[in-house]
Amino acid sequence: MKIDLDLHIHSSFSPDSLVSPGEIIRIAKTRGLDGVAIADHNTVRGGITGLDLNPDPDFIVIPGAEYSTEYGHVVGLFLSEEIDVKGRKPQGHTLSPTLPFEDVVNAIHAQGGIAVLAHPFQSREWLPAHVFNGAVKVDAIEGFNSRAGTRAYPNANSLASRCSSEYGIPALGGSDAHLSWEIGRAYTRIDLGGVSEGDVCLRDSHSLVKEAILAGRVECAGKQTHRAVVPLTELVKAYKRKTYHRMPYFVLKLIVAMLGSVGLRIENAQRERANAKNPPQQQ
């Protein structure tokens, strides 16, 4: 039996999302997903709320949270309680922008959770090997994150997939959705082994899913999200924090992102027309 899960979604418990846990579940089901992981910034409250709200035995909700470390963001999956974050404020905002990598991974493992390195090459091209094979290491990596290519490094997902192969760690897929229309743009296909459909209540199958992920019985796939999601998310954050004076700046960034996309489409269309008029000569 194989199931498709979006393993990285933010709810309204994050400072930069307005989508409630209940709405996430409803949308994910309409898009054919078998489950989701709700992983908010610095808090597991959104995931636990979603877990409590889920009435469907054929749909799984995995509580999680996303933490900032010196080596990037780490998502903890299958969490049951908060990890102590110094300076935590409502909606996951924290006074401490980065936490020690080893402390975060150890705290996730102490709960029986899985530590996933999220969009590792979104803003860098290199990470030390011990993150993947040291005494304290992640269990998996996001091989496809729908937002990863919208920032500094367009090849972020290909670098992550290469890292998965090099170190032999599972590659997971997640949309990193902060907006409702992003849900399901990336997913992880998980092979539950010899389990047959109807033999198991998926809602209560956390241990089966966890076992399959750690065993590497996973595939990731998805589509990249439009780069405009970044300033849109920043607008949501400014609105929720009531820093309204910053909103015009993010509106300008949104316009620039949209114009850049239009310009790229025009350039591609012109290139296609030129190739149609002057097809390459065969040797």
PLM regions and their residue ranges:
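A short, structured active-site edge motif that brings together acidic residues
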Residues: 62-69
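Binuclear metal-dependent hydrolase catalytic cores centered on His/Asp/Glu-rich metal-binding motifs
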Residues: 74-114
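Divalent metal-dependent hydrolysis catalytic cores, especially in the metallo-beta-lactamase
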Residues: 24-45, 113-116
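Active-site flanking residues adjacent to catalytic metal/cofactor-binding acidic residues
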Residues: 7, 39, 65, 118, ...
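Flexible loop residues that form catalytic
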Residues: 41, 120, 146
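Charged catalytic cores and adjacent phosphate/nucleic-acid-binding surfaces used
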Residues: 1-7, 11, 15, 19-26, ...
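Aromatic-lined carbohydrate-recognition surfaces of secreted/lumenal glycan-active proteins
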Residues: 113-125
